[in-house]
């Protein structure tokens, strides 16, 4: 399973309904799980992004989960593939 870091920012709609955000996060975790995505960590943050999520799953499953989340109109996301130190060692060995 691949690891992804997902940076989320509230839309105007999302911030108007911010009190519902914890319940929406619980619902997202359940929906993501049905798609084969495990939400490992979720943090509310202050700064450029409002929520940071660490998820594991196949790339297509992550994409499906984020597209489904986006259709609700409460947040916008940016995702990044993340590599563990061991995964990076394996990648770097291929450079030789």
Can you say where each PLM-predicted feature lies in the sequence?
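A compositional/biophysical signature of low hydrophobicity enriched in polar/charged and small residues
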Residues: 1-96
